[in-house]
Design a protein with these regions (language model features):
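Conserved AMP-binding A3 loop
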Residues: 46-50, 166, 188, 196-223
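Structural core segment of the AMP-binding/adenylate-forming
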Residues: 61, 65-66, 93-171, 561-570
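ANL superfamily adenylate-forming
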Residues: 128-192, 303-357
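Conserved ATP-binding/catalytic segment of the ANL
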Residues: 421-430, 434-490, 507
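Conserved AMP-binding/adenylate-forming core of the ANL superfamily
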Residues: 35-89, 106-111, 164-169, 215-216
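Core catalytic subdomain of AMP-forming adenylate-forming
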Residues: 457-475, 491-516, 560-563, 567
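Conserved AMP-binding/adenylation subdomain of ANL enzymes
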Residues: 219-244, 248-355, 366
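Conserved pre-ATP/AMP-binding loop-to-beta segment of ANL
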Residues: 31-34, 163-166, 173-200, 207, ...
Length: 581
């Protein structure tokens, strides 16, 4: 079965609009309007569309002055901040290629990524990232310059390849005066086939591979994800606010913030750090919010921790609210996310009593559209958020198809699935293996310098082989069973998807990580890591003393607590899928 929905998004080579052109157009229309904010010294600083476009041009000129030409690679190694976007779009504006690194990449991985991509310039955030680069720069023959954003600890370094960001921007200003028509000429020469970014995918069975996305890929993805088939209803506008906190070198964050910002004009707020996401959420109160399951699970666990520590009266009110939320969630799930008279009545009771304060406390009071992707999420977590008025739409996509595959849409939600194919997306299941295959104009053009791996991933007919096993639900929605390589076959010949069991276990506020094992074994076992905050709080309220994480995890009471969570999960699955140890 092959499913395809009509799309108004452009074909890869037809009428595409580049990212720089979208920024330019936004700046031309509403240059004085704020497009992003970052926090400095405790105060949110505004950056307008005019500021954005001006800095993008200066970056493009600065890169050109340093010898960067179309097709060259520019690497960015920084946390989420405005300069990441300036560097990214400025690079694309001169038809060069952006390559992002995770802030947590150690020096050895930095060396590999710089070597494999052949990056000529690295834009590094601070002393930590500069030190990594200097440690390996002798092994990176293509690397010519290291531009640092934060001078603290670096300004006194004496190295010929180092350059301060402000000096870099001033260099661009000088070059702009010498060649003011550069950006316009580059824009006129841009094609749909120009590679704009290398996004390196995790190398679980080998070194990371750089997925090449083009102007045409990104244009189709922006139109499809945001205008045509996203989970937003209505589509994003200039009045919407997003929080940027997931790594910008990942396709999900590009789609959720950078592309949405350029396409729809939403305002980006950059989280101060990954550790402050919860506090920044509460402060910013975004209207659109995308998160990976781990974030949703952490918010879910945090709510339970706070309620367990509340006064008896608050616990009573909270308990009543959660009963309402459960009834609302169950009703919404049964009706594909559509409200009924019953759910509206229950929500009208629960919102002023519990839900409003609860949503405000976790930073989700204003959220009108929420998404989850990049990994499976437990249905129990989704039901909870449904019940308090935050409907989370599961999304499925990957780097190799620019995050465009399937999505649950408002009013057509099927819990446990990743939704329907996006408009303009062909999707089918391999008859022999059940592998999900997709085909559309945002499918990447291949892996950088790895034609053999590309041939293994895209077949002669243009179908992308995702590596995920799926199954149709009601002939319209796709359910992800698991990665092909992760399917467990027990000694009894039973095929089991470990991710479903693992996600159910992690729905417990007391379990942080779970790995199910059972290939060629008579029964399943699980390695479980407890959630220190919630279990520690639980132990403290029961006056159970402990000294270390290990000491806490080995307490008989905690072992019993974990076993109860395992038993609750086992009740949801067939006997062959039960965790025995």
């Amino acid at each position: 079965m092959t499913t395809v929905l009509e799309s108004t998004a452009p074909a890869a080579g037809a009428g595409f609009v580049t990212m720089p052109a979208r920024i330019r157009d936004q700046a031309t229309r509403e240059g004085a309007r704020v497009c992003m904010r970052e926090k400095r010294y405790g105060i949110w600083q505004d950056i307008t569309w005019a500021d954005y476009w001006e800095t993008v041009q200066l970056v493009g000129h600065a890169l050109t002055s340093l010898g960067i030409e179309p097709g060259d690679r520019v690497a960015v190694h920084a946390e989420n901040r405005p300069e990441w976007l300036f560097a990214d779009v400025g690079t694309v504006a001169i038809r060069a290629i952006t390559m992002g690194l995770y802030p947590t990449n150690p020096a050895a991985e930095v060396a590999y990524l710089l070597q494999d991509s052949g990056s000529k310039i690295l834009i590094a955030e601070d002393q930590e990232q500069v030190d990594k680069a200097l440690e390996v720069e002798a092994d990176c023959p293509d690397l010519q310059w290291i531009v640092y954003l934060e001078p603290r600890g670096v300004r006194d370094y004496d190295h010929p390849k180092l350059m301060d960001w402000q000096d870099f921007i001033e260099r661009g200003r000088v070059h702009q005066g010498q060649d003011p028509g550069l950006i316009d000429r580059m824009a006129a020469d841009a094609t749909a086939d120009d590679i704009v970014t290398l996004i390196y995918t995790s190398g679980t069975t080998g070194p990371p591979k750089g997925a090449m996305l083009t102007n045409g890929n990104v244009a189709f993805a922006m139109e499809t994800l945001i205008a045509d088939g996203g989970f937003y209803n209505p589509p994003p506008t200039v009045d919407d606010v997003v929080l940027s906190y997931l790594p910008l070198c990942h396709v999900a964050e590009r789609a959720a913030t950078t592309w949405t910002n350029a396409q729809a004009g939403v305002t980006i707020h950059f989280a101060e750090s990954i550790e402050t996401v919860q506090a920044n959420l509460k402060e910013v109160q975004p209207t659109l919010f995308f998160a990976v399951p781990r974030i949703w699970e952490k918010v879910y666990a945090g709510i339970h921790i706070k309620m367990n520590a509340a006064s008896p009266l608050k616990k009573l009110v909270y308990g009543f609210g959660m009963k309402l939320a459960t009834r609302i969630g169950d009703e919404l799930v049964a009706n594909e996310g559509n409200h009924t008279a019953k759910t509206r009545l229950l929500y009208a009771i629960g919102y002023p009593l519990v839900f409003r304060a609860l949503r405000d406390r976790v930073g989700l009071r204003k959220v009108r559209a929420a998404g989850s992707g990049a990994a499976p999420i437990a249905p129990e977590v989704l039901r909870f958020f449904f019940g308090i008025g935050v409907v989370i739409y599961e999304i499925y996509g990957m780097t190799e198809n620019a995050a465009v595959a399937t999505v649950n849409r408002p009013g057509r939600v099927k819990l446990g699935t990743v939704g329907e194919p996006q408009p303009g997306t062909e999707l089918k299941l391999d008859a022999a293996t059940g592998e999900i295959l997709t085909r559309h104009p945002a499918v990447f053009v291949g892996y950088w310098n790895k034609p053999d791996k590309t041939a293994e991933t895209i077949d002669d007919d243009g179908w992308l082989h995702t590596g995920d096993v799926g199954e149709w639900v009601d002939g319209t929605h796709i359910k992800i069973v698991d990665r092909i390589k992760d399917i467990i076959i027990t000694a009894g010949g039973k095929n089991i998807s470990p991710s479903e069991i693992e996600n159910s276990l992690k729905a417990s506020p007391f379990i942080k990580e779970a790995v199910v094992i059972g290939d060629k074994r008579p029964y399943l076992t699980a390695l479980i890591g407890i959630e220190l905050d919630s279990v520690g709080d639980w132990a403290q309220h029961r006056r159970i003393p402990y000294t270390t994480y290990r000491d806490l995890a080995e307490k008989p009471e905690v072992l019993k607590l974990v076993q109860e969570a395992v038993a609750a999960t086992n009740d949801r699955f067939a006997r062959a899928e039960n965790v025995r140890k």
